[in-house]
């Protein structure tokens, strides 16, 4: 069964699915836990689908096309059914490589008559956590007035090139009162 994490105050304003990822779930599960807490604190219900454990990109990058396609189809079908039955406002990825793959589902299945529409919908619903926070939530971020830091930020290649996300992560950091420094040649 799916795991549903409800807002603590019971005042749900949105419902999203979270991709927990095959690698992240094992190596850094605290990132998923923090994502769920953050969304819940801002009245967002989070659902984690039990049958979705990998976006499929690892097999895709290793050239294991059939295995990758099985993951893609399973994910698309599962999220699309959840979208139709219970509603989803977004599918959240907090790993840029996975997010890029999910956003590519529509392109990957553009010539597949059976999967085309569903894959396109899943791609449209997919948001990086920084996109979702910026576009959907009015975050009241407490500024650090005591000590300001200079924070060097380097966007992952899959974030800046694959998903075309440039400003949201830096804007979120800036809202804390700290200065964001771009790394020379960070676009490479």
Predicted regions and their residues:
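Iron-sulfur cluster-binding electron-transfer modules in prokaryotic oxidoreductases
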Residues: 1-188
């Amino acid at each position: 069964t799916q795991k549903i994490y409800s807002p603590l105050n019971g005042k749900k304003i949105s419902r999203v699915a979270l991709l927990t990822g095959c690698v992240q779930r094992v190596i850094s599960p605290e990132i998923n836990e923090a994502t769920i807490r953050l969304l819940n604190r801002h009245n967002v219900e989070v659902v984690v689908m039990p049958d979705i454990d990998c976006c499929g990109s690892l097999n895709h990058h290793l050239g294991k096309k059939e295995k990758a396609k099985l993951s893609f189809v399973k994910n698309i079908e599962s999220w699309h059914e959840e979208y139709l039955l219970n509603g989803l406002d977004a599918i959240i990825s907090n790993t840029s490589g996975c997010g890029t793959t999910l956003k590519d589902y529509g392109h990957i299945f553009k010539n597949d008559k059976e999967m085309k529409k569903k894959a396109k919908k899943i791609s449209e619903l997919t948001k990086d956590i920084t996109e979702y926070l910026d576009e959907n939530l009015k975050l009241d971020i407490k500024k650090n007035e005591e000590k300001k830091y200079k924070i060097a930020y380097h966007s992952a290649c899959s974030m800046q090139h694959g998903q075309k996300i440039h400003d949201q992560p830096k804007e979120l950091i800036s809202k804390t009162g700290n200065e964001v420094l771009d790394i020379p040649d960070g676009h490479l």
